[in-house]
Curated annotation (Swiss-Prot):
GO molecular function: ATP binding; phosphoribosylamine-glycine ligase activity; phosphoribosylformylglycinamidine cyclo-ligase activity
Protein name as annotated: Phosphoribosylformylglycinamidine cyclo-ligase
Native organism: Streptococcus pyogenes serotype M6 (strain ATCC BAA-946 / MGAS10394)
GO BP term, example: 'de novo' IMP biosynthetic process
Primary location class: cytoplasm
Family of this protein: Belongs to the AIR synthase family.
Gene name in the database record: purM
Pfam families: AIRS, AIRS_C
Record's catalysed reaction(s): 2-formamido-N(1)-(5-O-phospho-beta-D-ribosyl)acetamidine + ATP = 5-amino-1-(5-phospho-beta-D-ribosyl)imidazole + ADP + phosphate + H(+)
Pathway(s) annotated for this protein in UniProt: Purine metabolism; IMP biosynthesis via de novo pathway; 5-amino-1-(5-phospho-D-ribosyl)imidazole from N(2)-formyl-N(1)-(5-phospho-D-ribosyl)glycinamide: step 2/2
One GO cellular component term noted in the UniProt record for this chain: cytosol
EC number(s) from the headed UniProt entry: 6.3.3.1
Origin organism lineage: Bacteria, Bacillati, Bacillota, Bacilli, Lactobacillales
Keyword Transport: no
């Protein structure tokens, strides 16, 4: 008996793995950008930092996954957008530090290599990379029978970006009186899905809930996370923003205070927050306390900007989308986030 057959009997299909690599090449090619060196399949991805033109480069990295949103992708057998979620979770964190994302690597672990399904996943990763302007320069697909069920997989990513040292956003520039501007989210994004799945556990996903304005539940739940790179980069390069917050797990309460120093607080005008229909549905069907919603979800704001009052109009002019003036920075009294 050959070694190959012995490996196959253990549950690892090497030929399927080769097929996955061939299938994803065309998707990886879509993400090419200046600075990429080498070819897909090398032992390490390479990037020429000098091609960025940054004078005092500081590398900024981020890694994340998509949590149990994956379980809904598996349940509904829809795998072509979950990769965008993975990219978004990484690059949005990097942009919050004032960096331009450069390249991305993905990691997929599965119980059984399904080349068609995994191509769908990577096509979503590639789409996210295109939207973010990053190159997909490497990755790993691990077939792990016994660790995962045959239909199960996990997905994680790693992104690296570069910032001009003088343009790093670390919260130190945020000051009392700054205006908080919100950029709309596309939906739930990629956090809070353990609760989301509990709330809608008995639903098929095909339901047209009245709160969802004609959209099927599963389409709303799997709406991919918005990528904010192309919206935020021009603002960073013009040094128009003092702080950026990526509103992810922990909602407003956990993420907004990460934008500024400990002696400051954010005062949020709840009436100005563009709450999406899905959050109203979650609150209703999940019997979730209203104040807790802001501790879990983005509530319709995926990226928050702290901007000096004199720069607000310029920021709004540069952003080709609705911009929500949802609050301001105040001196801290008790809580770091005050929702009025």
């Amino acid at each position: 008996m050959s070694e190959k057959n012995a490996y196959a009997k253990s549950g690892v299909d090497v030929e399927a793995g080769y097929e996955v690599v061939e299938r994803i090449k065309k998707h990886v090619a879509r993400t090419e950008r200046a600075g990429v060196m080498g070819v897909l399949g090398g032992f390490g991805g390479m990037f020429d930092l000098s091609k960025t033109g940054v004078k005092e480069p500081v590398l900024v990295s981020g890694t994340d996954g998509v949590g149990t949103k994956l379980m809904l992708a598996i349940k509904y057998d829809k795998h072509d957008t979950i990769g965008q979620d993975c990219v978004a979770m990484c690059v949005n964190d990097i942009i919050a530090a004032g960096a331009e994302p450069l390249y991305f690597l993905d990691y997929i672990a599965t119980g059984k290599n399904n080349p068609v399904k995994l191509e769908e996943v990577v096509s979503g990763v590639a789409e996210g990379c295109v939207q973010a302007g990053v190159a997909l320069i490497g990755g790993e697909t691990a077939e792990m029978p016994g660790m995962y069920g045959e239909d199960d997989y996990d997905l994680a990513g790693f992104a690296v970006g570069v910032a001009e040292k003088s343009q790093i956003i670390d919260g130190s520039k945020v000051k009392e009186g700054d205006i908080l501007l919100g950029l709309a989210s596309s939906g739930i994004h990629s956090n809070g899905y353990s609760l989301v799945r509990r709330v809608f556990a008995d639903y098929t996903g095909k339901e047209l809930l009245p709160e969802l304005e004609g959209k099927r539940l599963k389409d709303v739940l799997l709406e991919p996370t918005r990528i904010y790179v192309k919206a935020a980069l021009p603002l960073i390069k013009e040094e128009l923003v003092n702080g950026i917050g990526h509103i992810t797990g922990g909602g407003f309460i956990e993420n907004v205070p990460r934008m500024f120093a400990d002696d400051l607080a954010a005062e949020i005008d709840e009436d100005k927050v563009p709450v999406l229909p899905i959050f109203k549905a979650l609150e209703k069907y999940g019997d979730i306390k209203h104040e807790e919603m802001f501790e879990i979800f983005n509530m319709g704001v995926g990226l928050m900007l702290a901007v000096s009052p004199e720069n607000v109009n310029r920021v709004k002019d540069l952003l080709d989308e609705p911009v929500y003036e949802i609050g301001r920075i105040i001196k801290k009294a008790d809580d770091s986030v005050v929702i009025k």
